[in-house]
């Protein structure tokens, strides 16, 4: 029988809970970057479309999903706060400007489509269309800047590493967005969307090289931090996934392309986690074992997460199943 005494005595089932929560934090971040990432990418692609019908198609494709996808950002923040409260406090106090910027961009991205649909006036829709694009581009850029600064332990919000990583994440969302729009909208969108996706994945690989080069100069351990076998394996896997993505997109295998984009997203987040570990707050030197909460709340949280996360995942399975398949001409945002 589980008792308070047993829960306070040691880790649940003798599991390495500190390391598991570290991995879970980054898995949640990767899930948000992928699921909301293709929404962001669709918003960026929206800027390249002149035809009103094509723009409405983009809005219809992401309409059922974008607000639900943002749940994963809340779960990420909640998990970081619950498991590593000192890290949460330090990160959010050092980078509060970035946090406000991310929230502002997310609000703009959510508000703009609603306002866009309220009036069919050219000037009105041009303004809110641009706002939608701005929110869709700024949100991943600022989130990437936050992740880059977190990795190198910079106390400043705007750095070279932040700009490079932010640009990398933004282009990665376009990669995901092109595959998602191909899957949901199909022939309702011009073929240029696929070409944008192929071009974006090439730019993404170039930015990955730029990111690794910047980290080699910025990280205290230098290039040695990037030459470990896990990092090299993740980079090689990313190259293979990028090639698979481009081939799949050209052949119209949009689901395969979207799966490849998911692999690229989780791979990028995994590189950050591997390079950072065992530290979780490089700015202060805190390592995972030092930053984790005490045994009793850690065990209770682990039980709660084991029960609740499958429920959240089930909700998303139901959501995506209910709105599966390509959108029809009758659907609107």
What positions do the PLM features span?
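Membrane-interface helix-loop-helix junctions at boundaries between adjacent transmembrane segments
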Residues: 90-100, 108-169
């Amino acid at each position: 029988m589980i008792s308070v005494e047993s829960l306070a005595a040691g880790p649940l089932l003798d599991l390495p809970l500190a390391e598991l929560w570290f991995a879970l934090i980054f898995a949640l971040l990767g899930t948000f970057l992928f699921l909301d990432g293709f929404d962001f990418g669709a918003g960026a692609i929206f800027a390249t479309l002149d035809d009103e019908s094509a723009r409405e198609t983009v809005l219809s494709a992401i309409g059922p999903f974008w607000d639900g996808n943002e749940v994963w950002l809340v779960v990420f923040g909640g998990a970081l706060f619950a498991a590593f409260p000192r890290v949460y406090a330090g990160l959010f106090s050092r980078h509060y400007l970035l946090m406000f910027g991310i929230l502002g961009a997310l609000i703009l991205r959510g508000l703009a489509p609603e306002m866009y649909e309220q009036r069919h006036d050219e000037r009105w829709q041009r303004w809110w269309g641009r706002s939608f694009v701005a929110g869709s581009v700024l949100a991943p850029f600022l989130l990437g800047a936050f992740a880059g600064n977190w990795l190198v332990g910079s106390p400043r919000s705007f750095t070279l590493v932040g700009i490079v990583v932010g640009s990398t994440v933004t282009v990665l969302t376009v990669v995901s967005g092109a595959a998602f729009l191909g899957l949901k909208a199909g022939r309702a969108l011009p073929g240029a969307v696929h070409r944008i996706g192929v071009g974006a994945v090439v730019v993404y690989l170039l930015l990955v090289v730029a990111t690794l080069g910047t980290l080699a100069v910025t990280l205290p351990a230098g290039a040695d931090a990037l030459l470990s076998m896990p990092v090299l394996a993740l980079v090689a896997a990313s190259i293979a996934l990028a090639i698979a993505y481009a081939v799949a997109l050209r052949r119209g295998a949009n689901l395969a392309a979207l799966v490849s984009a998911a692999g690229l997203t989780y791979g990028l987040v995994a590189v950050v986690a591997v390079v950072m570990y065992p530290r979780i707050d490089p700015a202060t030197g805190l390592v995972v074992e030092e930053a984790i909460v005490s045994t009793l709340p850690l065990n209770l949280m682990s039980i709660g997460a084991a029960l609740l996360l499958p429920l959240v995942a089930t909700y998303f399975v139901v959501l995506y199943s209910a709105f599966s398949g390509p959108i029809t001409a009758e659907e609107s945002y």
